[in-house]
């Protein structure tokens, strides 16, 4: 059995993010992992295998802890935010490693939750979810979209679509405060992309 290099500091439920899901934010101190990783990365393939193995251990550990605690009703899906104190790599690379780790896991920790990785920030997530106007507007638009799009299809591509829109706006120099106004004028991603390419 591999040594566990993660330090799970706290597990916090973030309310009001999504009505059909319970979101658990798991703060994970990555300093021990990263110091070990510096040694492992001498050989790139063994470094990747090391991270994948460690992610599998973390996913199983966190999933078991969450399942032992009350508060995940059967009618709601579970989303687990692995919130790392330090990333070392980009979020995109961590997502690739996470996907590879999940592919190698069998059992309830793989099928019982959706996972995503973020980096710890000083922002209070609960307060952000309750007060941020852009997030609240996004949730309202998301509810409307849910009524017109098959839910499984929407979930599979949600992160990709957000990233495409965000990159498109940044590439075209659109300020954050104009996002909502521009998005309200378009009904799908294709028409938005076409408008920016004209």
Curated annotation (Swiss-Prot):
InterPro entries: Spo16_C, Spo16_N. Necessary for efficient spore formation. It holds the Pfam family Spo16_C. Keywords: Meiosis, Sporulation. It comes from the Eukaryota. One of its GO terms (cellular component) is nuclear chromosome. This is Sporulation-specific protein 16. One of its GO terms (biological process) is regulation of synaptonemal complex assembly. Coiled coil: none annotated. GO terms for molecular function: DNA secondary structure binding.
């Amino acid at each position: 059995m591999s040594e566990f290099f993660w330090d799970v500091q706290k597990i916090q439920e973030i309310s009001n993010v999504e009505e059909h899901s319970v979101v658990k934010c798991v703060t994970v101190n990555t300093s021990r992992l990263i110091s070990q990783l510096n040694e492992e990365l001498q050989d790139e393939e063994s470094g990747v295998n090391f991270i994948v193995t460690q992610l599998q251990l973390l996913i199983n550990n966190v999933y078991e802890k969450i399942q032992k605690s009350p508060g995940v009703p059967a009618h709601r899906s579970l989303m687990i935010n692995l919130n790392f104190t330090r990333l070392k790599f980009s979020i995109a690379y961590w997502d690739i490693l996470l996907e590879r780790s999940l592919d190698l896991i069998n059992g309830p920790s793989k099928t019982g939750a959706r996972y995503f990785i973020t980096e710890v920030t000083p922002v209070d997530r609960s307060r952000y979810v309750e007060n941020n106007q852009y997030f609240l507007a996004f949730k309202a638009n998301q509810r409307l979209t849910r009524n017109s799009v098959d839910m499984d299809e929407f979930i599979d591509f949600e992160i990709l679509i957000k990233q495409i829109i965000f990159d498109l706006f940044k590439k075209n120099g659109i300020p954050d405060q104009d996002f909502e106004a521009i998005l309200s004028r378009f009904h799908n991603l294709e028409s938005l992309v076409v408008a920016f390419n004209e």
